[in-house]
């Protein structure tokens, strides 16, 4: 069995309220991610992104990891781990530094980003991500990459995503109990955006909403930059609960009915379609019209989407007042397990009054039959995030080696200069042999 570290393999692990998913991806030379292992199992011990039964979570993680290892024929030692929950918060900050040389260096960029993130965050919270939005040099704004440009002062605008220390520790603890190392914690909504959005959508303005079992993770982009992140602690499970109460059926059966027969828009359901609904307490199952089922599902999905719409409208007003691009010309992208229900895009268009699409993972090869579903968007996004970290890590090593060689050559030149200076061989004192000697 090959160790994951022996090849360019990255592993993404999502521990959600409804499911635990583990994906193993191989980073190909062209930058594509080739999925070679998939593992998943129903989640136990999680609620709205938080751990409420550690032992149950550990068992679920182990089961998903075992499946992925078996399929990929590799030994997993570390993972990129998704994190969600209402404790996730965000803030946009600005930093400014003088430019040290004639032109901006990578060190200047790192300094200005460090200045921007050196702010007070909420008590018992820590910074999860620092994501640059844009830079400004003197009077020139909207710069994406300032390296090599000239100026006196540089400003950076960054988006900070923070999480509660203990919430993060608990989910990491569950993974470490399985003998795994966490390479990095990544906000689930950010991972999903890496998976389902195109560069054009980010540039035009888009909101991605990952609708899971316990939470809806939101990420809003305008002008190519991440402007806002939010977790709403209501999602697909409230729809399941409504079905269970409305028809007196066990929650597990209500979930199966929602997935197989559910529709978020009653007007597209045929009047003669019927659904068999199991009962509780040994009573015989009943038959009901699918239209009746849709009448329970549609109002709840509409309510959930309205919560997202309120968040978007508040953000757009704030961005407009700040003079920042606020239009979402690319509309809304819905993804996640609870986004797979029939009629959701049409239902959402009535709420958002803009174009809506259901987002599936992009830019992957390999086991796409398994992984190219909205259900796996976060896990695939973790692989893309891990790929970037791998490539950036290699570039950083190469940069350090180049810098080290450059420094060695500089020291050698300095030593040679001193030696030649001592012998009077520099600054025009170099002895010239007599022409006759050359003859």
From Swiss-Prot:
<dbReference type="GO" id="GO:0032153">
    <property type="term" value="C:cell division site"/>
</dbReference>
<dbReference type="InterPro" id="IPR050696">
    <property type="entry name" value="FtsA/MreB"/>
</dbReference>
<comment type="function">
    <text>Cell division protein that is involved in the assembly of the Z ring. May serve as a membrane anchor for the Z ring.</text>
</comment>
<keyword id="KW-0997">Cell inner membrane</keyword>
<dbReference type="Pfam" id="PF02491">
    <property type="entry name" value="SHS2_FTSA"/>
</dbReference>
<keyword id="KW-0131">Cell cycle</keyword>
<dbReference type="GO" id="GO:0043093">
    <property type="term" value="P:FtsZ-dependent cytokinesis"/>
</dbReference>
<dbReference type="InterPro" id="IPR043129">
    <property type="entry name" value="ATPase_NBD"/>
</dbReference>
<protein>
    <recommendedName>
        <fullName>Cell division protein FtsA</fullName>
    </recommendedName>
</protein>
<keyword id="KW-1003">Cell membrane</keyword>
<keyword id="KW-0472">Membrane</keyword>
<dbReference type="InterPro" id="IPR003494">
    <property type="entry name" value="SHS2_FtsA"/>
</dbReference>
<comment type="similarity">
    <text>Belongs to the FtsA/MreB family.</text>
</comment>
<keyword id="KW-0132">Cell division</keyword>
<dbReference type="Pfam" id="PF14450">
    <property type="entry name" value="FtsA"/>
</dbReference>
<dbReference type="GO" id="GO:0009898">
    <property type="term" value="C:cytoplasmic side of plasma membrane"/>
</dbReference>
<dbReference type="InterPro" id="IPR020823">
    <property type="entry name" value="Cell_div_FtsA"/>
</dbReference>
<comment type="subunit">
    <text>Self-interacts. Interacts with FtsZ.</text>
</comment>
